[in-house]
Amino acid sequence: SRGLGDVYKRQGLHYPRGQKTVNTILKYKERFIHDFGESINSQFKAYYAIANNESLTNKSEYEDFMNRNNIPYSEVDPNTLFNSNKVEALYLTKEYSYSYKIVLNKLLNHISDVKNVDTFSGTKVISITDKNERYQIEIENGEYIECKGVVNATYASTNIVSQLFNKPGFNLKYELCEVILCKVPDTLKDIGITVMDGEFFSIMPFGFSKYHTLTSVHYTPHTVSSPEPSFPCMKNGSCSPHNIGNCNLCLHKPLTAYEAMKTQYEEFIHPQLHGIEYISSMFAIKPIQISSEKTDERNTLIQMAKQPPFYISVLSGKISTFYELDSYLIELINLLKGL
């Protein structure tokens, strides 16, 4: 899900109303590049446009936002990419996409080099017992795992897992989202375009692949649910609000919204950049902070129980902001040393 929820390593350029998110992204930008530089694709031109109608941010506000955050940009004639009168302003800047698979493999390789670490994937937790200041966790193969603390970083399942541990969850809503993978014409091959600030679209290179992703604020979320991730497709029994499955393996996932996204794209974009071709869809359940509905913030949420057995729950708003967890992990290690 994380790969779908954050397919771009952005600088925060699409959050002009989310200054706190931008601050955090910029704070950890260089650290992420240092740690995962091999995953980053910066070899394309990134364009950001302000829509002429129904944008929540205008030209002067967006330029003030970029200047305030020391983000370099140059203004470009909108007619080079867009149909007449569709956008108020167009900017060329530096942006990135990244390969989440490269990030994942690097982390897995790092874990494999560490002694006394066992990994379990695709494993369901059956029961959890709090005994003698330790957790006893029963997993579906009949084994028990005993530990002094738990870090819950399960993205869309964060509140589900917290409930298993009898811990409070975050105030969330859930979107069943679709990201389109598409083949683009040569005229768009090394270009990324984002239209703001409202129910518009973005088309960006997908890591180092030969494809682009196409997303739409209006069409990417198929269904919204709150306070639990409860969607009509779950009625078929492959998953439930208390046991989220892999949407991409599900036979009951929604029909694609590609045609609607393509139509929106072509309404804005100059005909010379038409001709995108559908390749596939990636579906996932995406958690959204209720508090961010108006501000568009994507802050990292962290809760910590400091009495044994210890428990940390984290929901990272953007891929590069997971470093916010550092201070909590250091505190947890010190607490464990004190036992």
Role assignments for model-derived ranges:
Residues 1-2:
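Glycine-rich FAD pyrophosphate-binding loop
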Residues 144-196, 206-211:
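Central helical "cap/lid" subdomain
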Residues 42-43, 120-121, 172-176, 271-283:
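A short coil-to-beta-strand element that immediately follows conserved catalytic motifs
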Residues 209, 221-285:
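Flavin-binding catalytic cores
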Residues 6, 10-89:
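Dinucleotide-binding Rossmann-like beta1-alpha1 core, especially the glycine-rich loop
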Residues 91-149, 153-162, 322-330:
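Helical element adjacent to the flavin cofactor pocket in flavoenzyme catalytic cores
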Residues 259-339:
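C-terminal catalytic lobe of FAD-dependent flavoproteins
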Residues 40-50, 75-118, 136-137, 308-316:
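Helix-loop-beta segment of a Rossmann-like dinucleotide-binding subdomain
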